[in-house]
Amino acid sequence: MTNEIINRVANSGLITIDLANYAPNIEVLELDLKQFLYDGLILKEKDFRASLKGFNFIDYENKTTAVFCSASCIIPMWAFMLVASHLKNATSEIYYGNKDSVFQKLFLNNIEGLNAFEFENKKVIVKGCGQIPVSESLYVAITKKLKNRVASLMFGEACSAVPVYKKKI
């Protein structure tokens, strides 16, 4: 009998996906419309337009921008359109939402852009913990993307994986 240690995980053919690798690698700046409101609550069209015209958008140049309003008030749809028209000349991308929601949206786009054919009939483990927090919606997205492509889909680590899906033969 030999005392050779065999790495069964390395020989198993498992592919580990770390969702953190699909996190967007960009800075997202926020533009809160509250600063353009009268008393932080009311949008006056004339004042709003003048404020936008006088606003220095240089900080948003070539950045991804999240546009939202933190005030608990009603903002007409055209106001977001007007802000987008001003930002379009400066920013690289404009999204509705706060920084976190835009980051999640971009994260989701990266997962949806994943080439699922790379994992055709493979055993895949989606890593359960990593360097950055990953929302539940991203785990749902990767499951939708890979199910029916992979031979098996698991969650966790190779040493303690939870089976999620196994293709019927």
What name fits each language-model region?
Residues 70-77, 129-137, 160-161:
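Gly/Ser/Thr-rich loops at beta-strand to alpha-helix junctions
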Residues 116-141:
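Extended, charge-rich low-complexity interaction segments
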Residues 53, 112-116, 147:
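Signal for well-folded cores of large energy- and translation-related assemblies
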Residues 79-118, 158-161:
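Long, charge-dense
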Residues 82-88, 138-147:
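Short, non-transmembrane amphipathic alpha-helical segments
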